[in-house]
From Swiss-Prot:
Organism: Cupriavidus metallidurans (strain ATCC 43123 / DSM 2839 / NBRC 102507 / CH34)
Family: Belongs to the FlhC family.
Predominant location: cytoplasm
Cofactor binding note from Swiss-Prot or TrEMBL: Binds 1 zinc ion per subunit.
Gene Ontology biological process terms from the UniProt entry: bacterial-type flagellum organization; positive regulation of DNA-templated transcription; regulation of bacterial-type flagellum assembly
InterPro entries the record matches: FlhC
Presence of keyword Transport: no
Protein name: Flagellar transcriptional regulator FlhC
Entry annotated with the keyword Transcription regulation: yes
The protein's assembly and partners: Heterohexamer composed of two FlhC and four FlhD subunits. Each FlhC binds a FlhD dimer, forming a heterotrimer, and a hexamer assembles by dimerization of two heterotrimers.
Length: 213
């Protein structure tokens, strides 16, 4: 029975490793989350990707998550992750995987380019766990956004409600009044009120998909 359990456990570990590689996880992420040797993970990565795992350190700057566009993307992922964790139905790494898939789905729905890689999303959660990054609620839209722990700004307003001037440089705002409707199940995943998600294309949330900083 023990042998059977160990075999099934190994199968689950490899299945998870395959998912992580397909989502773009770096080798360091795989080593942290999967109980498989580095040598076997390297061979698995090469088999799935056709190339050796990239070398070098993981992204290590929390400041990246504070710039305008990355902050919006990171905050969307974080809201999905926290929603799934609150349900208590999946392990932490499974919540990360599911939240990232939801993030990718949502970004593709609004026609925006992916900004947050899986490895950066995973790294951001480590910054949050260590207290280097925190989240605050925007006083305008009620969404939860990533901030630095030493950011002393009060009455916080997010980058969607008050985008920086450079965000619109060289790009004309969309003027169509056609609403972007978010699926109900996805509305439940992000901590922004549903009414705030179904606003005109030229409203702050739609700007995310119509501007290039």
């Amino acid at each position: 029975m023990t042998t059977r359990k160990s075999v099934l456990r190994e199968v689950e570990e490899f299945r998870l490793a395959v998912e992580l590689v397909e989502l773009g996880a770096r080798l360091q992420v795989l080593e942290s989350e999967v109980a498989i040797s580095r040598d076997r993970l390297t061979r698995l990565y090469k088999e799935l990707r056709g190339v050796s795992p990239p070398k070098g350190q993981l992204p290590s700057s929390p400041e990246w998550f504070l710039t305008w566009r990355p902050n919006v993307h990171a905050s969307l992922f974080l809201s999905a992750y926290r929603f799934l964790m609150a349900q208590g139905k999946q392990s932490r790494i499974r919540c990360i995987v599911s939240a990232y898939r939801l993030y990718v789905e949502h970004i593709s729905l609004i026609g925006e380019d992916l900004t947050l890689s899986f490895t950066r999303a995973w790294t951001m959660l480590r910054f949050l766990d260590s207290g280097t990054l925190v989240s605050s609620t925007c006083k305008c839209c009620g969404g939860s956004f990533v901030r630095h722990k030493y950011d002393l700004q009060t009455n916080f307003v997010c980058g969607l409600c008050a985008p920086p001037p450079r965000a619109a440089k060289g790009k004309k705002l969309a003027t169509s009044a056609e609403p972007f409707v978010v699926p109900e199940d996805l509305q439940q995943t992000i901590s922004i009120e549903p009414a705030a998600m179904n606003r005109p294309k030229d409203a702050p949330l739609r700007r995310m998909g119509s501007l290039k900083p």
